Amino acid sequence: MKLRHLLLGAGLGICTAVVVRQYVMKPYISSEKALRIVKSAFKQRGPIDGSWIYTQPEPYNINGETVQVYKTGITRSAFGELEQYEVMVDAKTGEIVDVIDTIAS
């Protein structure tokens, strides 16, 4: 009986440690989550025609500070005109740090 309890406790401890380690060691949000954040923000101002994201974080300089960001893009139509935006999302916090209006071709 005691060996069984010991093995059960050890197994439970190892499983818990693995789950906690994966949660703590993950420094960035997923690129999918970053894109959902951007799409949610833009959907508040109207429908979206298309979106994209670079799945690897890259350095971006904002206000003299370099942060790791996911670069995303949104395309939509407004008043018959095509609008395109590049959006930088902080890879650690998910905060939108910059929006650049690009010229649609």
From Swiss-Prot:
InterPro entries: PepSY. Pfam families: PepSY. It comes from the Bacteria. This is Uncharacterized protein YtzB. The gene is ytzB.
